[in-house]
Amino acid sequence: MSYRDNEYSGNYNGKEDGYNSRGRYGGGYRNNYSRGGGRGGFNDGASYGYDQRGQGRNFYESDGPGANLVKKDWKNETLIPFQKDFYKEHENVRNRSDAEVTEYRKEKEIVVHGLNVPKPVTTFEEAGFPNYVLKEVKQLGFEAPTPIQQQAWPMAMSGRDMVGISATGSGKTLSYCLPAIVHINAQPLLSPGDGPIVLVLAPTRELAVQIQQECTKFGKSSRIRNTCVYGGVPRGPQIRDLIRGVEICIATPGRLLDMLDSNKTNLRRVTYLVLDEADRMLDMGFEPQIRKIVDQIRPDRQTVMFSATWPKEVQRLARDYLNDYIQVTVGSLDLAASHNIKQIVEVVDNADKRARLGKDIEEVLKDRDNKVLIFTGTKRVADDITRFLRQDGWPALAIHGDKAQDERDWVLNEFRTGKSPIMVATDVASRGIDVKGITHVFNYDFPGNTEDYVHRIGRTGRAGAKGTAYTYFTSDNAKQARELVSILSEAKQDIDPKLEEMARYSSGGRGGNYRRGGYGRGGFRRGGGYGNRNRGFTGSNSAPLARSRW
């Protein structure tokens, strides 16, 4: 059931902890919001012509999404104050000495930066969440917070701008989702024409949908409505949700700009902004869209940013849009794979990959409880591999950008529920899909960089579980051999001698002269060996399934 579609009459009587019928502290003002005011102290000189708070010019001079938006001059406006500091330090937390906190952070690999960073919590109760949130947590069976949650919750609940850096699968979504619910419940109720109070920007539709699912679970008790705004589907239902009014909007940048451009919603009420997987959004070229969107939001908002990595581009975005932020990093900033994942890298010829995959899949699926995610470099190869596996008796399904959204949703559901044990995907799924119970990841094609390799294999071995990742490495990938060996060594994995030799001969940047050494056959396309068979064929998910082997 989606709470965003409900019409509320205000007759909900679930009062608790001093909250009104919507779970919110009473507030009188409704449509009296001014659209301006700022934090003051704006500085010139930031990248791309933006000042300290991202007040820019360049991105408004081009056509495309958001071309009709007018950049707001916040310095000449007055903003009505809002509440954002809800953190009350628990007695147990307060009584811990600095030495104990330092030791605990060291044990959990938590590193913090900034002034007056709150101490980490160790339980849900210590985080200071209201009873209605704690009840949802207990009902859903959560036992203990993850390290990123332990430190991020007191940071976000205190109303500070913050950056959280942690590996995929570490619980980042709840790190901002639960504080967002508390934030909403302390704001005045929405009035007709109001936009959302919380805005979450995400790089992919799949990730946006998963965030929405978490928001729905934990917003249920206080009837917080949400909607998910992304491309590839009709705008009508999304427009309907926005017009009816939602407290939370989870969106991909392009579709949200489309909605803003056509006056289907506004961001005047946004006081809690989340940039999730910021590094991925920048990798996908969303920086201009992000800047246009954020410029429409009052600058005294609370902004939280989460990322799996901390490159210079993400650091610049944080400097431009976060005010006096504090930062938590869990684990090393160096690129590293989870030690819960067994990494098996095989050096093979391009022409042998398909046969190798068939052999490995047969071995893996001897256990019917296993769930396999296969990554390919292109949509064509994803479809080819899906057909190959189905013809071999394995009920594989493919997901990539050329599939219609309803088909993608169906494939995800089939995979998530275990009806299909194999999903073949392009990188649209590498960081946007969170499916529990993935036991094996296959890199049929090695990605363009080792960072994507780490994110791909991070689909397994999540939340303390064990996982296995198979990778077929060819001479085409030689320039990444040295970095891959480093990742394998750090995780104490066995290394194929052929890969070590490839790394020695590789320049690490241009591929070296290794291809002259004879491992590759040359002339084959990446993911090749198929020739021109099935060229132009579509509908891989409807390819005939041979006599089932599963």
From Swiss-Prot:
- What coarse category fits the chief subcellular location reported for this protein? cytoplasm
Q: What is its EC number?
A: 3.6.4.13
Motif DEAD box, per the record, lies over 276-279
**Xref: Pfam families:** DEAD, Helicase_C
Gene Ontology cellular-component terms listed: cytoplasm; cytosol; nucleolus; nucleus; ribonucleoprotein complex
- Region annotation (RNA-binding RGG-box) maps to 510-533
Report the transmembrane regions from the record. Answer: none
Region Disordered, annotated ranges? 1-25, 525-550
* Residue stretches making up the Helicase C-terminal domain: 340-503
Say yes or no: keyword RNA-binding present.
yes
The short sequence motif called Q motif sits at 122-150
What GO molecular-function term can you cite, just one?
RNA helicase activity
Give the InterPro entries listed for this entry: DEAD/DEAH_box_helicase_dom, Helicase_ATP-bd, Helicase_C-like, P-loop_NTPase, RNA-helicase_DEAD-box_CS, RNA_helicase_DEAD_Q_motif
Domain Helicase ATP-binding: residue ranges: 153-328
Residues reported in the UniProt entry to bind ATP: 166-173
* GO BP terms, alphabetized: alternative mRNA splicing, via spliceosome; nuclear-transcribed mRNA catabolic process, nonsense-mediated decay; rRNA processing
- What is its subcellular localisation? Cytoplasm; Nucleus
Q: Which keywords annotate this record?
A: ATP-binding, Cytoplasm, Helicase, Hydrolase, Nonsense-mediated mRNA decay, Nucleotide-binding, Nucleus, Ribosome biogenesis, RNA-binding, rRNA processing
| Protein's UniProt keywords contain Signal | no
What's its top-level EC category?
hydrolase
Q: Which family does it belong to?
A: Belongs to the DEAD box helicase family. DDX5/DBP2 subfamily.
**Subunit arrangement?**
Associates with polysomes.
Q: What does this protein do?
A: ATP-dependent RNA helicase involved nonsense-mediated mRNA decay and ribosome biogenesis through rRNA processing.
**Domain description:** The Q motif is unique to and characteristic of the DEAD box family of RNA helicases and controls ATP binding and hydrolysis.
Q: What is this protein called?
A: ATP-dependent RNA helicase dbp2
Species this protein is from: Schizosaccharomyces pombe (strain 972 / ATCC 24843)
Species classification? Eukaryota, Fungi, Dikarya, Ascomycota, Taphrinomycotina
